[in-house]
Amino acid sequence: MTTTTSGAPASLGRNELPPHLDENLLTPRFYTTEFEKAAKTDLEIARKDFEAMFKEMEADYNLKHFDRKASLERLDELSPEDKAVYESYLVRSVVSEFSGFLLFKEISNRFKKAGRQELGQFFTFLARDEARHAGFLGRALKTEGINVDLPNLPKKRAATFFPLSWVLYSLYLSEKIGYWRYILINRHLKANPDKVCAPLFDFFEPWCQDENRHGDCINLMMRCWPGMTKGFRGKLLSRFFLWTVFLTHTLTVCERGEFYELLGIDPVLFDEEVIIQTNNTSKNAFPWVYKFEDGKFLSMRIDILNAFKKWRNQNGIKKPLALGKFVLLILKQFTLPMEKTDAVRYG
């Protein structure tokens, strides 16, 4: 598929991926999980909190904030290079949001088929928000002359299976790190309005509110499975997913730093602030989080980034050696000290 600068959006061939979506470890993915196990979630141990969260999601506070008639045409003319950077961000974001929609929708359907109507409707609310976000991103892409065929995209990319505990840990972090990404970009653009190149960014404030609520919903689900956050298992899952999500965020943000620079944001400092805030927020859900006081975890990001770039750019016999250095660094970061939290748990 090719992009166009005018006229109707270009269309994808049957086996084509959207532009700017090369297949690699940092590409957004589609997921599936243990739906039958999820349907056995014991809500009674969290009944009061669940009903309060259900009412909040049902209220759909951001319905009127997402105006489907609002223009998403870019405000500024961009150079071909900056246009490609902006489009790349939109494509990867729309795939990520649509992936969340599909997962939440499937969980909702499985709950309803299992007779768990409350839980089914609960996840319908989450799917509603993700679909709304994907719709706005899709509209923004169409103004750039790109039409991503979202319904057929999962047919071109195999879904990745995760156990339920993995899905809940990763979903919580995905929503909370998304919240901090959106809110920090929103705050920066409000302080620097000259950097707002498209009206899409005007929707980032309600957008981040949705992400924050979704994280709280997933936290509630985790609390209904006490075994996921107890003992050695809880510590290992906390360590693994915090490390994985933070590492992926660092590599993605800094590898695609041109987008943040387009907005006047230093990608390295942005990545650091997002990680600090997400780690702190995770104290409300995870039994353990990384200890940042000594600065080792954050400072190692720079060494890891440099090793990653060297490996990617290296050729010949030196490439395996560069990969070995990169792997040793990330494993060293993985084993850094953690601290116990006071996260509320049921059971």
Swiss-Prot record:
It holds the Pfam family Rubrerythrin. Its cofactor is Fe cation. InterPro entries: AcsF, Ferritin-like_SF, Rr_diiron-bd_dom. Its EC number is 1.14.13.81. One of its GO terms (molecular function) is iron ion binding. GO terms for biological process: light-independent chlorophyll biosynthetic process; photosynthesis. It catalyses: Mg-protoporphyrin IX 13-monomethyl ester + 3 NADPH + 3 O2 + 2 H(+) = 3,8-divinyl protochlorophyllide a + 3 NADP(+) + 5 H2O. Keywords: Chlorophyll biosynthesis, Iron, Metal-binding, NADP, Oxidoreductase, Photosynthesis. Belongs to the AcsF family. Catalyzes the formation of the isocyclic ring in chlorophyll biosynthesis. Mediates the cyclase reaction, which results in the formation of divinylprotochlorophyllide (Pchlide) characteristic of all chlorophylls from magnesium-protoporphyrin IX 13-monomethyl ester (MgPMME). This is Magnesium-protoporphyrin IX monomethyl ester [oxidative] cyclase. It comes from Prochlorococcus marinus (strain SARG / CCMP1375 / SS120).
